[in-house]
Design a protein with these regions (language model features):
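Catalytic core segments in nucleotide and nucleic-acid processing enzymes
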Residues: 1-18, 30-34, 235-405
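Ser/Thr-centered flexible coil motifs
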Residues: 211-214, 316
Length: 405
């Protein structure tokens, strides 16, 4: 297995071999120096029978990590970059470039030239500056004009760079997201990097970017640079790229917050503190997600746990006490609340997007109430988060909770 994966992924501590099994310590994508494409899905995800669905799930995972990367700037401790052997930006940029190509096609640089005596697109400032007018009856008239003519520069280097990188992007990701290489990209398969150094190309794109003003053109240049920079550190005999996080629980919290949160706990939750002599040090207690529905309050904790059939590994004393305390301290701090519910949300796979799992309580202390556990379908959650579509999930959660308890 180490031969297939290469040694870098083991050196980075992203996977280890235990009893002849390889255990991955990240979620995301990894392309090794042996061109092995590894996809590691989050906990709770089960491979679908449909290859079409699998391709869609892979695309949604890419979009999810790309969104998290953009919004959270990938905390260095949570980012997987294989030192000098690759960069996570390449896969993210490759996926963006594929989507942009499908929408807009290959970039064509249109150059403006100026010609005489064409009545279309007259450039009046240049006509006045360079053409001699005819004056008749105190009226000024121009018999010759300077006109603007737009021509397509298909040999432009930026067009070639774009075509080459999009071709490489399809070659890398296409098979895994259900896309074949479009035939119009075949002409860009020539080894552009044999003619130019990567740093030269990056410098050229940066210069070209200064001449563009539309958002699409500027963003396109940025993504081309991201892709190339992601490969510029790759060793000569290596082709490692990755888009991955070591600790997916932070992404799971973001997903649950996006889907369910509609209020903030800031300035509501009281802060525990230490008093030592004349100094006081505060710590914070903030629930992951808070959802208000009329006179109901749902205190939600995103739990990135694997749910086993033998019930091992469920949230223990510390997690339970913290959640009970959240409800206890919020009882009199939110106005016009009649009912409060403690909720754990676990990743899972189910035909139902939200499914009741079970409940927890403290034996003999009924006054604390229950913590209700629900599974959230990973595939559907990734899709909604990736496409910025919460899809009435707040309403769905409220309905499922009320139906289940």
């Amino acid at each position: 297995m180490k031969v297939n994966l290469g040694v870098n992924i083991f050196k980075a501590g992203l996977c280890e071999e235990v009893n002849q099994l390889v255990i991955f310590r990240f979620v995301g994508f990894y392309i090794s120096d042996n061109n092995e494409f590894i996809v590691v899905f989050p906990k709770g995800y089960k491979l679908p029978d449909s290859e079409v669905q699998l391709s869609e799930d892979i695309a949604n995972l890419i979009n999810t990590l790309s969104r998290y990367q953009k919004e959270s700037n990938f905390d260095p401790e949570n980012t997987q970059i294989f030192g000098d052997a690759g960069n996570y930006t390449s896969l993210s940029a490759a996926h963006w470039l594929i989507k942009d190509f499908i929408t807009n096609g290959i970039f064509i640089n249109n150059k403006i030239s100026y010609v005489r005596n064409q009545n279309n697109n007259i450039d009046w400032p240049k006509t006045i500056k360079y053409m001699n007018p005819v004056i008749s009856n105190k009226q000024v008239a121009y018999l010759e004009f300077v006109s603007r003519k737009k021509r397509t520069d298909e040999s432009n280097l930026l067009t070639r760079v774009h075509g080459y990188i999009v071709y490489q992007s399809f070659k890398i990701l296409g098979p895994f997201i259900g896309l074949k290489i479009p035939p119009e990209l075949i002409e860009y398969t020539n080894q552009l990097l044999q003619e130019y150094d990567i740093n030269q190309i990056i410098h050229f794109i940066e210069q070209e970017r200064n001449n563009f003003f539309t958002d699409r053109e500027v963003h396109l240049c940025n993504k081309l640079i991201e892709f190339l920079k992601g490969n510029s550190s790759v060793e000569a005999n290596s082709n490692i790229m990755c888009l991955a996080v070591r600790h997916f629980h932070v992404v799971w919290e973001k997903i649950c917050s996006f889907l369910f949160a509609n209020m903030s706990a800031n300035n509501i939750m009281p802060n525990p503190f230490w008093q030592v002599n004349d100094k006081s040090i505060k710590t914070s207690q903030i629930p992951d997600v808070m959802l208000r529905n009329k006179n109901q309050l749902y205190i939600i904790d995103a739990k990135y746990y694997t749910l086993y059939k033998n019930l091992k590994g469920l949230p223990g004393w510390g997690d339970l006490v913290k959640q009970f305390f959240y409800l206890y301290t919020l009882k009199d701090r939110v106005d016009n609340i009649r009912e409060m519910f403690n909720i754990f949300v676990f990743p899972g796979t189910s035909n139902e997007i939200i499914k009741y799992y079970g409940k927890s309580a403290v034996e003999g202390v009924e006054s604390l109430g229950y913590i209700y556990g629900f599974t959230l379908d990973v595939s559907k959650a990734l899709k909604m988060y990736a496409h910025y579509n919460s899809n009435q999930m707040k309403k769905n959660l409220v309905e499922v909770v009320q139906r289940s308890i």
